[in-house]
Design a protein with these regions (language model features):
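Periplasmic c-type cytochrome electron-transfer domains
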Residues: 1-94
Length: 94
């Protein structure tokens, strides 16, 4: 079986810039920028909403659990996204 996308550039939405861009990060280059990667990680791994990804993810698919969210507004003003982005930018290559 042949992969028809092998060797092709993956164009994805750069959420922080609001435009189409080349995917560079994440599984199969599905994220365009390290800022988007940081914001996505905060939301999906830790449940922290931020200016780039504002919508809560239903815990384990149970959206009724969001009724008990003590903070209905954004959990981060963008500072955590910037700090995580800076941390990953300054990490040395393995």
């Amino acid at each position: 079986m042949c992969n028809t996308n092998a060797g092709r550039v993956n164009m994805v939405i750069n959420h922080s810039a609001g435009r189409l861009a080349v995917g560079k990060f994440g599984w199969k280059a599905q994220v365009a920028s390290l800022v988007d990667f940081s914001a996505d990680a905060l939301l999906n791994e830790m449940g922290i909403t931020n200016p780039i990804f504002r919508t809560e993810v239903c815990p384990q698919g149970n959206c009724r659990a969001l009724d008990f969210n003590p903070v209905a507004s954004l959990n981060d003003d963008g500072r955590a996204v910037d700090e995580l982005n800076n941390f990953m930018t300054l990490l040395a290559a393995p």
